[in-house]
């Protein structure tokens, strides 16, 4: 290490000390750039790390899960499977709906993925059913990502079908056009339609069939081109009354003649205005409603998107009748803004605490002002670089700046303390600034680059976790770099002009008391250090025991992935027996809603029943529970969830699964609980054999709670077993049978009514009110070869069987997903290990594969790379220190301080009841960079004393420890108080910030005590080792 000799003229700081105007203007430029940058920074909950995800939904009313899988999902999957950059493809095929979710690699732009999906859909079109009502529709949205905003549209005066028609046309479409919106859905499905309910007995009495009626309706309602007449002088467009617009028009439609008399549709059917799908319903606080869910595109800024929607809502609602009310039930940005505000407050508090510590140690207002200027200047200047890198103001970048508060003041403190020491010896302020800054310049550079070296591995973390912490690491590194620049330029210049012997010597009663206290502390430390140096092997034993303890604590501490946040919104799934109908589910949701709304923490509730792209089966319902603001309720979200589940548990025939919404969404499907684990096979039969066994085994594990699976193979099904020979003899084809059944029971969309603003469907079905259940099949009649009609029972036998309610695929193979939570007292790491052990115990065959999904999969990947990440940070720091010191030995002395930080952090986490998650791991990595600065300051001065004053290694390190004790204590306390607001945070988003603060405060407390004694002993040990090596190998020269 090159140390500037006494009498140096300031080194890199000289120019800035001697040119105060230029220095001031340079700092003003940094400040101005930061202020301007801050105004352009967007606000977000977390850095944008979403996987490019696209959802493809295909609706085919009346189709069974098996038909949806084979006729719709499989052809689409074959085409999607050929797309480049596809990371994972999952699908869910249920009665009448197919949902395929495509997750692409992080590096693939969403627009490129969109083009590939559209091309794949086009290629699969010819393979899809010809009577598919609508082609597959894709949306740039992750279905597992909760809506950024939920609105309820209600009316006391208008039917819900009319309300939805207006809202869909006037509101939903406009919101869909907002930049960042990926999908707007109207839950409840009350789209207007003309419903034709055939009276099977009346139709049969007239010798007609449902197919006859369908053909008559489709032929009577058309909307096609008719041409034009082009004469010598005039052109005439041809038009006709080929469309029927209302239920009355259809009611008067003649469908046949009997004995010369017309038979109108109204004679054999009930024709009415109704909903397109009568098996869909949504409620807001138990009142029927159209619930509008707004989801963002992956990567879109949630705050900017929600602000745009809020701005246009008043204008959109003005176009609606006064009886239609639009209410914002939930807005995720409310909690995001509150969380950011709390973090900003903690940042300001950290700055105030750090400045207070500086004044406590320096007891001089001018000396306090100097670092008081350096801290905000370094932090504000960081905003300019953040804008350039397309970062945002989010919880992680604000946490980085809060932690940086303790870092950036370190450099200024070290410079001020060294310059003040020379002024107190009688040097002139300018000479002291030149000499002190020149002497300390290399130390500042060592501190800065060794700390940045710790952050380098974070930049190379892969997948979504790496993307998540890149903004954190870069923001912190930029703040540290700017701090170093400020400390080598502005700080010594201000010292030269603001400090003097008079100001430093001026003391009041408080200053003298503090000085006496510090003198006593330093004296006590000196006596303790002398004893430690006289018993080096005992000290080394303590250091070695600390290393072993850190390894043991690392093994036993509970491990998690990402803190569970309280964002004030709970997602729920209500599960009922597999044979449940829509009517029974609607009744059950009313009972559950009544219990939930009685809870004092609940502000509003939306529920949805029915099968669409969001809800897979009739025996399940979706819930969104919006809680009161955190300061208006007594309990956190997990306590509210426990209370709600207890309240609902007494309702027979239902199971309620609840989980809090999170800002970080890695999953690709809505799950009942927080964590997922999949079981995949080549056939459904293999799944049906192993799913019950594995589920029973998982439910018996104490490390898991609320274990469930989406495997539902006990749905009731009526199997129509057609005697093909009998049917052929009567001239009846299988297509005739399918059409007759579809016409009767499929809510078949048989025709379209076109208007200037929208399109509406004509729905055909049998009126089954008088013949419920399987008896309705006896009313089905088919047309035979001779024109007569025969009952279905003449050619078919009806069997009652069990069938799957939904069929799920993962990468084109059958799969079932197990969902689970982790009970109190256990960690996600415990749960994962228990599942892996259970797999081994069951000895699953080779054709059965298992895989963790979503956050559980990310946890496994992060856990596997954590140790290597810490090793990489240590190696990077060793390389940087080795280059700076031109030594192989001294970096090891400095790095010997690291186990103390690990022990302190892990002990603090265990005592606080926190898991070792990725936030806490980042804290430990930062500690690696912080605690080594104590050793750097000691060793720098010890080496200087050895080389310049000829001191012995023992005397040099002893003097260095006493000389640098005050700045070491000051900088450590500054870093500790910078992290303290995070550790003590209680507001919105505190779950995210607290592990970082706990790890850093615990690590700093323990390392501060131990390293002050272990570092000098290890320094002397390696000094003796170096002399031994030189004596054994005289030709080997090592500049230690």
From Swiss-Prot:
GO terms for cellular component: plasma membrane. It is found in: Cell inner membrane. One of its GO terms (molecular function) is xenobiotic transmembrane transporter activity. The keyword Transmembrane applies. HAMAP family: MdtB. Belongs to the resistance-nodulation-cell division (RND) (TC 2.A.6) family. MdtB subfamily. This is Multidrug resistance protein MdtB. The lineage of its organism: Bacteria, Pseudomonadati, Pseudomonadota, Gammaproteobacteria, Enterobacterales. The gene is mdtB.
């Amino acid at each position: 290490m090159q140390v500037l000799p006494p009498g140096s003229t300031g080194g890199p700081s000289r120019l800035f000390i001697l040119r105060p105007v230029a220095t001031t203007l340079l700092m003003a430029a940094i400040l101005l750039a930061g202020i301007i940058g801050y105004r352009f920074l967007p606000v977000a909950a977390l850095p944008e790390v979403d996987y490019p995800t696209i959802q493809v939904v295909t609706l085919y009313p009346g189709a069974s899960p098996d038909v949806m899988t084979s006729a719709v999902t499989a052809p689409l999957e074959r085409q999607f499977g050929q797309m480049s950059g596809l990371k994972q493809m999952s699908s869910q095929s249920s009665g009448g709906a197919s949902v395929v979710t495509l997750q692409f690699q992080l590096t693939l732009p969403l627009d490129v993925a969109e083009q590939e999906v559209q091309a794949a859909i086009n290629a699969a079109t010819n393979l899809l059913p010809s009577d598919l009502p609508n082609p597959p529709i894709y949306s740039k949205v992750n279905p597992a990502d909760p809506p950024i905003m939920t609105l309820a549209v209600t009316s006391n005066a208008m039917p819900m079908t009319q309300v939805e028609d207006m809202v869909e046309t006037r509101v939903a479409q406009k919101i869909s056009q907002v930049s960042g919106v990926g999908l707007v859905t109207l839950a409840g499905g009350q789209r207007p339609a003309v419903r034709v309910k055939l009276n099977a007995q009346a139709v049969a009495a007239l010798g007609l069939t449902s197919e006859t009626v369908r053909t008559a309706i489709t032929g009577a309602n058309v909307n096609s081109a008719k041409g034009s007449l082009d004469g010598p002088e005039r052109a005439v467009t041809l038009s006709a009354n080929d469309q029927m617009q209302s239920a009355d028009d259809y009611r008067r439609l003649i469908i046949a003649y009997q004995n010369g008399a017309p038979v109108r549709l109204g004679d054999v059917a009930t024709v009415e205005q109704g909903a397109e799908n009568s098996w869909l319903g949504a409620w807001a606080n138990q009142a029927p409603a159209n619930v509008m869910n707004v989801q963002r595109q992956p990567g879109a800024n949630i705050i900017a998107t929600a602000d745009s929607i809020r701005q246009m809502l008043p204008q959109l609602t003005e176009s609606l009748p006064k009886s239609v009310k639009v209410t914002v039930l939930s807005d995720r940005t409310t909690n995001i803004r509150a969380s950011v505000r709390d973090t900003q407050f903690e940042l300001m508090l950290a700055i105030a605490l750090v400045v207070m510590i500086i004044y406590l140690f320096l007891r001089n207002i001018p000396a306090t002002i100097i670092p008081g200027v350096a801290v905000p200047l370094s932090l504000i200047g960081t905003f300019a670089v953040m804008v350039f890198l397309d970062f945002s103001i989010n919880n992680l970048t604000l946490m980085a700046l809060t932690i940086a508060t303790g870092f950036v003041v370190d450099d200024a403190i070290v410079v001020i303390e060294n310059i003040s020491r020379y002024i107190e010896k009688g040097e002139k302020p300018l000479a002291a600034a030149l000499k002190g800054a020149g002497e300390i310049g290399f130390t500042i550079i060592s501190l800065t680059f060794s700390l940045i070296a710790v952050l380098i591995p974070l930049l190379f973390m892969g997948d979504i976790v790496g993307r998540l912490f890149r903004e954190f690491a870069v923001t912190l590194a930029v703040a540290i770099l700017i701090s170093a620049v400020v400390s080598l330029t502005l700080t010594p210049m201000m010292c030269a002009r603001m400090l003097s012997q008079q100001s430093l010597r001026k003391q009041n009663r408080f200053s003298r008391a503090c000085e006496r206290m510090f003198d006593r502390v330093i004296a006590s430390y000196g006596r303790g250090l002398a004893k430690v140096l006289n018993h080096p092997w005992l000290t080394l034993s303590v250091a070695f025991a600390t290393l072993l303890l850190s390894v043991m604590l690392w093994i036993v501490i509970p491990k998690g992935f990402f803190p569970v946040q309280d964002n004030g919104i709970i997602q729920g799934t209500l599960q009922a027996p597999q044979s449940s109908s829509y009517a029974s589910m609607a009744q059950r949701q009313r009972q559950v809603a009544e219990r939930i709304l009685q809870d004092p923490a609940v502000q509003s509730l939306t529920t949805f029943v029915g099968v669409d792209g969001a809800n897979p089966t009739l025996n399940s319902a979706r819930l969104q529970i919006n809680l009161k603001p955190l300061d208006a309720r007594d309990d956190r979200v997990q306590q509210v969830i426990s209370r709600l589940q207890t309240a609902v548990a007494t309702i027979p025939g239902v199971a309620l699964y609840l989980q809090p919404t999170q800002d970080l969404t890695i999953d690709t499907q809505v799950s009942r609980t927080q964590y997922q684990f999949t079981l995949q096979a080549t056939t459904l039969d293999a799944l049906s054999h192993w799913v019950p066994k594995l589920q029973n085994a998982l439910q018996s594990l104490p490390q898991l709670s609320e274990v469930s699976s989406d495997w539902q193979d006990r749905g009731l099904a009526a199997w129509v077993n057609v005697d093909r020979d009998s049917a052929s003899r009567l001239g009846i084809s299988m297509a005739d049978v399918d059409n007759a059944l579809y016409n009767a029971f499929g809510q078949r969309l048989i025709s379209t009514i076109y208007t200037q603003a929208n399109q509406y469907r004509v729905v055909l079905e049998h009126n089954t009110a008088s013949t419920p259940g399987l008896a309705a099949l006896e009313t089905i009649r088919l047309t035979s070869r001779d024109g007569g009609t025969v009952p279905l029972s003449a050619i078919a036998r009806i069997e009652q069987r069990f069938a799957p309610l939904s069929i799920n695929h993962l990468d084109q193979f059958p799969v079932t997903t197990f969902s689970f939570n982790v009970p109190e007292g256990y960690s996600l790491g415990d749960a994962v290990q228990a599942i892996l052990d259970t797999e081994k115990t069951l000895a699953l065959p080779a054709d059965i594969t298992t895989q963790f999904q979503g956050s559980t999969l990310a946890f496994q990947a992060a856990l596997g790379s954590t140790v290597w990440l810490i090793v990489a940070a240590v190696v990077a720091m060793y390389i940087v220190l080795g280059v700076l010191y031109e030594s192989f030995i001294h970096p090891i002395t400095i790095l010997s301080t690291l186990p103390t930080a690990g022990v302190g952090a892990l002990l603090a986490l265990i005592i606080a009841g926190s898991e070792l998650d990725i936030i806490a791991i980042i804290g430990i990595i930062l500690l690696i960079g912080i605690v080594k600065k104590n050793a750097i300051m000691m060793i720098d001065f010890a080496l200087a004393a050895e080389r310049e004053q000829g001191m012995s290694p023992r005397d040099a390190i002893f003097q260095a420890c006493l000389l640098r004790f005050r700045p070491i204590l000051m900088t450590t306390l500054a870093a500790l108080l910078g992290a303290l607001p995070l550790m003590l945070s209680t507001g919105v988003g505190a779950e995210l910030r607290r592990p970082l603060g706990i790890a850093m405060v615990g690590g700093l407390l323990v390392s501060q005590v131990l390293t002050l004694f272990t570092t000098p002993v290890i320094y002397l040990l390696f000094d003796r080792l170096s002399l031994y090596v030189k004596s054994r190998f005289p030709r080997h020269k090592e500049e230690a």
